[in-house]
């Protein structure tokens, strides 16, 4: 059996396969802003997948998420480049006036913006990592919880008692 010369001379390609760890996603309406800004997003089904590992390399390769029997129902391919954050800000800001999307105050938009940028930070770190996707989401949740409590304190100290009650009612 002969080996093709073009295969032996071709450069090595690195591909990172990302399969989410057990996560139940609610596909919240806030994802609409990310979908509109980035042009692509992943919705994980309520089914669980087995725990998996994610490898990130430089230069950041495109990320493929493949459909597995008990895993994601949507298949997407996108580049790991932090290029849509400004677009996301404008799209999220335009949704602030529409309560159907869950944005009732500036805090919600800030939390969405922070979460998106933290995801970009983990996707474009200049080192090679192997980590669990579930651990990453847990860490992001903890950071956002601390940031949310910080925003609540700022809002509480800068508003009247009636506005204070309304703000607390909006933050779950």
From Swiss-Prot:
Q: Where in the cell is it found?
A: Membrane
Lineage, top-rank taxon, reads: Eukaryota
Q: Give the keywords, sorted.
A: Membrane, Transmembrane, Transmembrane helix
Give the transmembrane region(s).
109-129
CC terms in the record's Gene Ontology section: membrane
The answer, when asked if Transmembrane is one of the entry's keywords, is yes
* Membrane topology summary: Single-pass membrane protein
* Major localization listed first in the record, in broad terms: membrane
Anything else the record notes? Partially overlaps CCT6.
Q: What is this protein called?
A: Putative uncharacterized membrane protein YDR187C
Source organism: Saccharomyces cerevisiae (strain ATCC 204508 / S288c) (Baker's yeast)
Q: What is the lineage of its organism?
A: Eukaryota, Fungi, Dikarya, Ascomycota, Saccharomycotina
């Amino acid at each position: 059996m002969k080996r093709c010369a073009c295969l032996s001379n071709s450069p090595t390609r690195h591909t990172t396969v990302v399969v989410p760890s057990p996560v139940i996603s609610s596909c919240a309406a806030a994802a609409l802003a990310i979908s509109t800004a980035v042009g692509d997003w992943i919705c994980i089904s309520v089914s669980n997948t087995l725990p998996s590992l994610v490898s990130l390399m430089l230069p950041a390769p495109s990320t493929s998420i493949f459909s597995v029997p008990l895993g994601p129902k949507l298949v997407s391919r996108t580049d790991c480049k932090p290029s849509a954050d400004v677009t996301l800000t404008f799209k999220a800001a335009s949704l602030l006036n529409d309560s159907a999307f869950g944005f009732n105050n500036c805090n919600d938009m800030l939390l969405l913006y922070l979460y998106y940028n933290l995801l970009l930070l983990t996707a474009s770190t200049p080192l090679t990592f192997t980590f669990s996707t579930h651990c990453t989401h847990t860490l992001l949740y903890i950071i956002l919880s601390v940031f949310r409590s910080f925003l609540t304190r700022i809002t509480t100290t800068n508003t009247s008692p009636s506005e204070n009650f309304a703000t607390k009612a909006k933050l779950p």
